[in-house]
């Protein structure tokens, strides 16, 4: 049986004594890969969690820790470090209390993601159709700076949705459709970071 502590200790021997520069980050990724290649299942997640925390500690000298954690929550940063740093740099500059409030309202509303498709025929309020149209304009084929700007631009439609629409409608189909709409919106936030950690 492979012992997790032994695996991690062996992998840490691959790390340089100094944590300065990109060498540490690359060796950290290598150490994690060394461990993961020898195990499977749940223990793999535990190993990645350990090394992701090491990465966050290292990078917290340069970036806010909550931003690092938010950007690591939905995508494993060790899989694509370049992408991770790009997202961290953009989210670290975020200065939109209204966007944060809306994103967290969506996250609080969704105890779990809906697995249903949004059905336009079930819309009862104009704000529902408006929000869907706005969500559909958000493109991932842009820089993260531009992506964040898109989220900020659609936020008035998110606010109007919450002002005009009672999500938990007494009609179960209408309620489920609204939760599906919010799940779609949540996926747009999650592409960048877990806003609940900001």
Where are these regions (language model features)?
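Amphipathic alpha-helical "coupling" segments that flank catalytic cores
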Residues: 1-198
């Amino acid at each position: 049986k492979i012992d997790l502590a032994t695996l991690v200790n062996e992998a840490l021997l691959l790390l340089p004594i100094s944590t300065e520069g990109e060498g540490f980050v690359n060796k950290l990724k290598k150490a994690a890969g060394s461990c993961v290649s020898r195990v499977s299942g749940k223990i793999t997640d535990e190993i990645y969690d350990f090394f992701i925390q090491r990465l966050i500690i290292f990078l917290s000298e340069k970036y806010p820790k909550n931003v690092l954690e938010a950007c690591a929550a939905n995508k494993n940063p060790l899989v694509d470090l370049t992408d991770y740093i790009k997202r961290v740099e953009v989210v670290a500059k975020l200065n939109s209390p209204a966007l944060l409030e809306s994103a967290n309202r969506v996250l609080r509303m969704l105890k779990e993601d809906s697995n249903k498709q949004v059905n336009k025929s079930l819309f009862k309020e104009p704000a529902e159709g408006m929000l869907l149209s706005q969500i559909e304009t958000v493109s991932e084929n842009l820089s993260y700076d531009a992506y964040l700007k898109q989220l900020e631009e659609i936020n008035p439609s998110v606010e109007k949705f919450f002002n005009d629409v009672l999500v938990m409608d007494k009609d179960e189909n209408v309620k489920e459709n609204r939760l599906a709409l919010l799940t779609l919106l949540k996926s747009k936030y999650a592409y960048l970071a877990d806003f609940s950690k900001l």
